[in-house]
């Protein structure tokens, strides 16, 4: 991130822009207005985490399965997955899911529910996969009866939008210190904080809403870029090609022609 700002900067900037007194301290301030600004900043930061998959918050989760264990605890800072990033790196296949409750019960109780691909869902704060890893259904096992774990990988957005300025690799989802580094775009966050404060006071938010939306639209697309789109896409072929064959594990023959 190009602009590094802390909690005190965001609150101070918002208050000064609204014509309020400049605070000497923020998180530990006894002033009721400053306390409300910090509380609204926590709300605004949480909203912005959900509102857009910020590149600063994207993390990769590598999961190595265990014999007989179908469900695994999610990362402690998990907020939500990036869609279609779930992959079985052992077999080089994308995972199938997330499955609905109805599909999951069909997988567990149906007559024709098994297959080589791994299915998944998120339930009760855990990442659950089907089939359950075991020596029987692990297709990569070199020796019959030997368990070989699957290595699964996926990307998610962390809920922690603040970084401790004094402690390495320490992140928070709520303000704890004036010096906590804001990982979100500070100008969007400042505009949103002003809007939240005006809204909380029951005042007319028309101007601040316009300012926030304009700042959001102007800066959000610069966060990580975007691909170029064509107005004349090519239709995919119905014949055998790169779009409809597996990524690997297909028989290439023994080199002998018949």
Annotate each PLM feature:
Residues 1-258:
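Glycine-enriched, solvent-exposed interface loops adjoining structured elements
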